[in-house]
Protein backbone atom coordinates (compact mmCIF):
# COMPACT_ATOMS: atom_id res chain seq x y z
CA UNK A 1 0.00 0.00 0.00
CA UNK A 2 1.24 3.48 -0.85
CA UNK A 3 2.56 5.46 2.16
CA UNK A 4 0.56 8.57 1.20
CA UNK A 5 -2.65 6.53 1.08
CA UNK A 6 -1.81 4.99 4.47
CA UNK A 7 -1.50 8.44 6.05
CA UNK A 8 -4.74 9.56 4.41
CA UNK A 9 -6.55 6.53 5.82
CA UNK A 10 -6.12 7.71 9.43
CA UNK A 11 -9.49 9.08 10.61
CA UNK A 12 -9.28 12.81 11.36
CA UNK A 13 -10.55 12.46 14.94
CA UNK A 14 -7.83 9.88 15.72
CA UNK A 15 -5.23 12.10 14.06
CA UNK A 16 -6.34 15.12 16.14
CA UNK A 17 -6.41 13.09 19.36
CA UNK A 18 -2.88 11.78 18.82
CA UNK A 19 -1.40 15.15 17.92
CA UNK A 20 -3.18 17.01 20.74
CA UNK A 21 -1.18 14.90 23.23
CA UNK A 22 2.23 15.70 21.75
CA UNK A 23 4.56 18.50 22.90
CA UNK A 24 4.22 21.75 20.94
CA UNK A 25 7.71 21.33 19.43
CA UNK A 26 6.75 17.95 17.93
CA UNK A 27 3.49 19.36 16.53
CA UNK A 28 5.41 22.24 14.94
CA UNK A 29 7.86 19.83 13.31
CA UNK A 30 5.00 17.66 12.04
CA UNK A 31 3.60 20.58 10.04
CA UNK A 32 6.50 20.02 7.63
CA UNK A 33 5.43 16.44 6.77
CA UNK A 34 2.82 17.41 4.19
CA UNK A 35 0.47 20.19 3.14
CA UNK A 36 -2.45 18.17 4.52
CA UNK A 37 -0.83 17.85 7.96
CA UNK A 38 0.10 21.55 7.97
CA UNK A 39 -3.51 22.44 7.14
CA UNK A 40 -4.97 20.21 9.87
CA UNK A 41 -2.44 21.20 12.55
CA UNK A 42 -2.85 24.88 11.66
CA UNK A 43 -6.65 24.85 11.87
CA UNK A 44 -8.49 26.79 14.58
CA UNK A 45 -10.19 23.59 15.78
CA UNK A 46 -6.85 21.88 16.38
CA UNK A 47 -5.39 24.96 18.12
CA UNK A 48 -8.33 25.05 20.55
CA UNK A 49 -8.09 21.29 21.19
CA UNK A 50 -4.32 21.51 21.74
CA UNK A 51 -4.72 24.40 24.19
CA UNK A 52 -7.40 22.49 26.12
CA UNK A 53 -5.26 19.35 26.30
CA UNK A 54 -2.14 21.33 27.28
CA UNK A 55 -3.87 23.03 30.19
CA UNK A 56 -5.04 19.66 31.59
CA UNK A 57 -1.48 18.30 31.76
CA UNK A 58 -0.08 19.12 35.21
CA UNK A 59 3.36 20.74 35.38
CA UNK A 60 5.89 21.27 38.13
CA UNK A 61 7.27 24.74 38.74
CA UNK A 62 10.23 25.53 40.96
CA UNK A 63 11.16 29.05 42.06
CA UNK A 64 14.56 29.56 43.69
CA UNK A 65 15.96 32.73 45.26
CA UNK A 66 19.63 33.53 44.50
CA UNK A 67 21.91 34.75 47.30
CA UNK A 68 23.01 38.09 45.91
CA UNK A 69 20.97 39.13 42.95
CA UNK A 70 17.68 40.67 42.07
CA UNK A 71 16.27 37.67 40.21
CA UNK A 72 14.41 34.47 41.02
CA UNK A 73 15.19 31.39 38.95
CA UNK A 74 12.23 29.39 37.63
CA UNK A 75 12.31 25.81 36.34
CA UNK A 76 9.33 24.03 34.81
CA UNK A 77 8.85 20.37 34.05
CA UNK A 78 6.02 17.98 33.17
CA UNK A 79 4.55 16.36 36.28
CA UNK A 80 5.64 12.73 36.55
CA UNK A 81 2.80 10.31 36.98
CA UNK A 82 3.42 6.66 37.38
CA UNK A 83 0.50 4.68 35.94
CA UNK A 84 2.24 1.37 36.62
CA UNK A 85 3.99 0.49 39.85
CA UNK A 86 7.12 -0.92 38.23
CA UNK A 87 7.70 1.80 35.66
CA UNK A 88 10.46 4.38 35.95
CA UNK A 89 9.65 8.08 36.01
CA UNK A 90 12.08 10.42 34.24
CA UNK A 91 11.59 14.17 34.49
CA UNK A 92 13.57 16.81 32.66
CA UNK A 93 13.38 20.56 33.09
CA UNK A 94 12.34 21.89 29.72
CA UNK A 95 12.14 25.57 30.50
CA UNK A 96 13.97 27.95 32.76
CA UNK A 97 13.91 31.68 33.08
CA UNK A 98 14.69 34.49 35.49
CA UNK A 99 12.41 37.12 37.01
CA UNK A 100 13.05 39.94 39.47
CA UNK A 101 12.86 38.50 42.97
CA UNK A 102 9.86 39.54 44.99
CA UNK A 103 9.90 37.03 47.84
CA UNK A 104 12.27 34.58 49.44
CA UNK A 105 10.24 31.36 49.47
CA UNK A 106 10.99 28.20 47.54
CA UNK A 107 7.75 27.38 45.75
CA UNK A 108 6.63 24.09 44.25
CA UNK A 109 3.65 23.76 41.94
CA UNK A 110 1.97 20.54 40.96
CA UNK A 111 -1.06 20.81 38.72
CA UNK A 112 -3.06 23.86 39.70
CA UNK A 113 -2.02 24.05 43.38
CA UNK A 114 1.01 25.74 44.97
CA UNK A 115 2.77 24.84 48.17
CA UNK A 116 6.02 25.58 49.97
CA UNK A 117 8.48 22.75 50.42
CA UNK A 118 10.39 23.16 53.66
CA UNK A 119 14.11 22.89 53.08
CA UNK A 120 16.13 21.75 56.11
CA UNK A 121 19.06 24.06 55.27
CA UNK A 122 19.01 27.76 54.38
CA UNK A 123 20.91 28.14 51.15
CA UNK A 124 21.18 30.52 48.20
CA UNK A 125 21.04 29.17 44.63
CA UNK A 126 23.85 30.27 42.32
CA UNK A 127 23.64 30.03 38.53
CA UNK A 128 21.55 27.64 36.44
CA UNK A 129 20.54 24.16 37.50
CA UNK A 130 20.08 20.93 35.58
CA UNK A 131 17.49 18.16 35.83
CA UNK A 132 18.65 14.54 35.51
CA UNK A 133 16.29 11.56 35.88
CA UNK A 134 13.72 13.49 37.88
CA UNK A 135 16.21 15.22 40.20
CA UNK A 136 16.88 18.96 40.00
CA UNK A 137 20.54 19.82 40.77
CA UNK A 138 21.83 23.34 41.33
CA UNK A 139 24.80 25.09 42.92
CA UNK A 140 24.20 26.99 46.14
CA UNK A 141 26.09 28.80 48.87
CA UNK A 142 25.53 28.43 52.61
CA UNK A 143 27.05 30.52 55.41
CA UNK A 144 30.84 30.09 55.31
CA UNK A 145 30.80 27.38 52.65
CA UNK A 146 31.21 29.01 49.25
CA UNK A 147 29.51 26.34 47.13
CA UNK A 148 27.69 23.07 47.41
CA UNK A 149 25.44 21.03 45.14
CA UNK A 150 21.78 20.88 46.16
CA UNK A 151 19.56 18.16 44.75
CA UNK A 152 15.77 18.08 44.90
CA UNK A 153 14.09 14.79 44.04
CA UNK A 154 10.82 15.71 42.31
CA UNK A 155 9.15 12.39 42.95
CA UNK A 156 9.85 12.18 46.69
CA UNK A 157 10.09 15.95 47.33
CA UNK A 158 13.38 15.51 49.21
CA UNK A 159 16.45 17.76 49.37
CA UNK A 160 20.06 16.51 49.56
CA UNK A 161 23.25 18.53 49.99
CA UNK A 162 26.67 17.63 48.58
CA UNK A 163 29.61 19.66 49.91
CA UNK A 164 32.50 20.22 47.49
CA UNK A 165 35.59 22.45 47.53
CA UNK A 166 35.48 23.64 43.94
CA UNK A 167 34.56 27.17 42.84
CA UNK A 168 32.47 27.12 39.70
CA UNK A 169 29.07 28.41 38.59
CA UNK A 170 28.12 25.51 36.34
CA UNK A 171 26.90 21.93 36.58
CA UNK A 172 27.05 19.58 33.60
CA UNK A 173 25.11 16.38 32.89
CA UNK A 174 27.80 13.76 32.22
CA UNK A 175 26.39 10.30 31.42
CA UNK A 176 23.40 10.84 33.72
CA UNK A 177 25.41 12.30 36.60
CA UNK A 178 25.87 15.93 37.63
CA UNK A 179 29.50 17.00 37.47
CA UNK A 180 31.09 20.21 38.58
CA UNK A 181 33.92 21.13 36.18
CA UNK A 182 36.98 22.54 37.94
CA UNK A 183 40.13 24.08 36.57
CA UNK A 184 43.21 23.92 38.75
CA UNK A 185 46.26 25.91 37.66
CA UNK A 186 49.64 24.84 38.97
CA UNK A 187 52.50 27.26 38.61
CA UNK A 188 52.56 30.58 36.85
CA UNK A 189 51.61 31.60 33.33
CA UNK A 190 54.79 33.68 33.12
CA UNK A 191 56.71 30.52 32.20
CA UNK A 192 54.80 30.32 28.91
CA UNK A 193 55.46 33.90 27.79
Curated annotation (Swiss-Prot):
Q: Which PROSITE patterns match?
A: FBOX (PS50181)
- Please give the coiled-coil regions recorded for this protein: none
Q: What is the lineage of its organism?
A: Eukaryota, Viridiplantae, Streptophyta, Embryophyta, Tracheophyta
Name all F-box domain ranges. 4-53
| Pfam families xref list | F-box (PF00646), FBA_3 (PF08268)
| Species per Swiss-Prot/TrEMBL record | Arabidopsis thaliana
Name of the protein described by the UniProt record: Putative F-box protein At1g31072
Q: Which domain of life is it from?
A: Eukaryota
What InterPro entries does this protein's entry cite? F-box-assoc_dom_typ3, F-box-assoc_interact_dom, F-box-like_dom_sf, F-box_dom
Amino acid sequence: MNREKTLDSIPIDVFLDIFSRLPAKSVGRSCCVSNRWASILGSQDFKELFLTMSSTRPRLLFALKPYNGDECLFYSSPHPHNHYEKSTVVVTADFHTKFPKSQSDCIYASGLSWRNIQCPLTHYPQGKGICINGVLYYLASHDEKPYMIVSFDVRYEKFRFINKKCHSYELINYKGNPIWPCLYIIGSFSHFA
